[in-house]
């Protein structure tokens, strides 16, 4: 079995991006800029933002974090986004989720200029992805897609099963695989026989938040299995796939942690650079 090493693939991608930033600076005499807005003191969000900032600096992006207290008014955040929209030195804007309850997530997402939406969550970018137009793609599915392509460059005709239908993972992942001429099935909590669906699949992407849901007898021999889940259990962090047993049947499998996570951050940097390039056309 091939262990899909997200850390290694992400490091390779970051090196490519670092070289690209050098070339862009030489060509345009400026570099892409990423601004992250962080609200409140949630520990996981603080950690994610630190990792994003470190990675951005590593590839040579201009990086800034704007921090607000938990009680910040929604208007303050929206006004700041409007200000960043107008700032030509900022290529990408990201508001770290989740947000406090008094702030409307959708309103925040829709205030970010689609051309600066590095998360790919703006309805216009969601529409662009499903219509086949160029725009930002959500970072986690993009990372999963790049890992799958690393293992199997020719995906045409493959059967792919998505477990989970979220706007964040399931739906955009399905669109990316459809573009590659996969036959895609999106499954979810109401799917009648999930195991039977999975047994048909050449590619399984599990993003449903149920610890070790996907067992060895759900996976056909030589399938590629991507585990997006991060679940805290008594035995530590586990994914949505029972790693030990599935590793005995799968052709390739991502670990948790160290699989999808590093690629998500690398793809955020990729999206920022792509936003910059589109803005220079």
UniProtKB/Swiss-Prot annotation:
Q: Which residues bind NADP(+)?
A: 164-166, 189, 230
Which positions form S-S bridges?
none
This entry's Enzyme Commission designation comes to 1.5.1.5, 3.5.4.9
Keyword list, A-Z: Amino-acid biosynthesis, Histidine biosynthesis, Hydrolase, Methionine biosynthesis, Multifunctional enzyme, NADP, One-carbon metabolism, Oxidoreductase, Purine biosynthesis
The biological pathway it contributes to is: One-carbon metabolism; tetrahydrofolate interconversion
Q: Does the keyword Oxidoreductase apply?
A: yes
One GO MF term attached to the UniProt entry: methylenetetrahydrofolate dehydrogenase (NADP+) activity
* Pfam families xref list: THF_DHG_CYH (PF00763), THF_DHG_CYH_C (PF02882)
One annotated GO biological process: L-histidine biosynthetic process
Q: Does the keyword Cytoplasm apply?
A: no
Which reactions does this protein catalyse?
Answer: (6R)-5,10-methylene-5,6,7,8-tetrahydrofolate + NADP(+) = (6R)-5,10-methenyltetrahydrofolate + NADPH; (6R)-5,10-methenyltetrahydrofolate + H2O = (6R)-10-formyltetrahydrofolate + H(+)
Q: Where are the transmembrane segments?
A: none
Identify the GO cellular component terms for this protein.
cytosol
- Subunit (UniProt): Homodimer.
HAMAP family for the chain: THF_DHG_CYH (MF_01576)
| Function text | Catalyzes the oxidation of 5,10-methylenetetrahydrofolate to 5,10-methenyltetrahydrofolate and then the hydrolysis of 5,10-methenyltetrahydrofolate to 10-formyltetrahydrofolate.
Give the family this protein belongs to, as stated in its UniProt record.
Belongs to the tetrahydrofolate dehydrogenase/cyclohydrolase family.
What name has this protein been given in UniProt?
Bifunctional protein FolD
Organism of this sequence:
Pelagibacter ubique (strain HTCC1062)
Q: What is the lineage of its organism?
A: Bacteria, Pseudomonadati, Pseudomonadota, Alphaproteobacteria, Candidatus Pelagibacterales
Gene name? folD
């Amino acid at each position: 079995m091939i262990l899909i090493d997200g850390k290694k693939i992400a490091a390779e991608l970051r090196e490519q991006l670092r070289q690209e930033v050098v070339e862009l600076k030489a060509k345009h005499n400026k570099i892409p800029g990423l601004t992250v807005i962080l609200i409140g003191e949630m520990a996981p969000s603080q950690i994610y933002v630190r990792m994003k900032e470190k990675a951005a600096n590593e590839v040579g992006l201009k990086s800034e974090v704007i921090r607000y207290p938990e009680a910040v008014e929604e208007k303050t955040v929206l006004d700041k986004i409007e200000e960043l929209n107008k700032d030509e030195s900022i290529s990408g804007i990201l508001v770290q989720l989740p947000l406090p309850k008094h702030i409307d997530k959708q309103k925040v997402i829709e205030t970010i200029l689609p051309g600066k939406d590095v998360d790919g969550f703006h309805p216009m970018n969601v529409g662009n992805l499903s219509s086949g137009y160029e725009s930002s793609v959500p970072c986690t599915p993009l990372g999963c897609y790049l890992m799958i392509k690393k293992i199997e460059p020719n995906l045409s005709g493959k059967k792919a099963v998505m477990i989970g239908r979220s706007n964040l993972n399931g739906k955009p992942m399905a669109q990316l695989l459809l573009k590659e001429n996969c036959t895609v099935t999106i499954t979810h909590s109401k799917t009648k026989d999930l195991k039977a669906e999975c047994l048909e699949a050449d590619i399984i992407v599990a993003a449903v938040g149920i610890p070790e849901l996907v067992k060895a007898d759900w996976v056909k021999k030589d399938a590629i299995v991507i585990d997006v889940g991060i679940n805290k259990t008594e035995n530590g962090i586990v994914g949505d796939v029972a790693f030990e047993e599935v590793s005995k049947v799968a052709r390739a499998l991502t670990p948790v942690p160290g699989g999808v996570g590093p690629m998500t951050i690398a793809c955020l940097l990729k999206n920022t650079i792509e936003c910059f390039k589109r803005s220079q056309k």
